[in-house]
Amino acid sequence: MIKLAASTLVFLLTLVLTTASSSSGQSLLADKVIVIDPGHGGIYPGAVHNGIREATVNLAVALKVRDRLAATGAAVILTRTTDTNLAAPGASLADDLQARVDVAKTAGADIFISLHANADENVTAAGVIGFFPAGRPDDLARALKDGAVHGTAAVDGGVRPANFYVLRNSEIPAALLEMGFLTCPEEAACLSEDTYQNQLAEGIVKGIITYFQDH
């Protein structure tokens, strides 16, 4: 009876903490506008390795993040919801990237997050990496990276400054998250699995909540 009571107490305590965390996230994000950018798409497939297209992985995770964020009351906007590029036919890659930045600007977004999958000549390269605009704070990138790493037990690739178009041209807090390496067979397999994508999405949402707790 004592063991049963103890286990029941642990369960109830876990339930209370989980509920409190969920409620906190809901109240914290209720008035936030968040733009999620699934990198690449359409004529820009991104990295293609081990039979997996980066654009497909990016979109799959982004949709899962959107659904979880929507449950918190946040206004969530995806730059794309299908396998398409954003710029008009005949436009340049820069035009496509600018169109993604413009989505956030038009929406009056609070943060901009671009999701990607990495590639490297070294097939053992692995891990989640958060990129932030050079010369600006790294807190959003760090929160996202930490959330994704804790959610998946992936290799922690740290955070790094970068001059990527969508970062340097964003006027709001922005981060680009490399969710893993498609050139690494083990990570490629994980990134294509629904269960792992769900874990990534959960971690990313927790990272967003952590970011707004400090801002």
Regions from the PLM with identified roles:
Residues V16-S22:
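C-terminal segment of classical bacterial N-terminal signal peptides
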Residues P137-R160:
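Active-site-adjacent substrate-binding region
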Residues N58, P137, A141, E193, ...:
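Short, charged, low-complexity patches
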Residues M1-T8:
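Positively charged n-region of N-terminal signal peptides that target proteins for export
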Residues T8-V16:
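Bacterial N-terminal signal peptides
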Residues D102, A107, S114-N122, G158-H215:
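Active-site-adjacent mobile loop/cap segments within catalytic or ligand-binding domains
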Residues S24-L140, H150:
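Catalytic-core regions of hydrolytic enzymes
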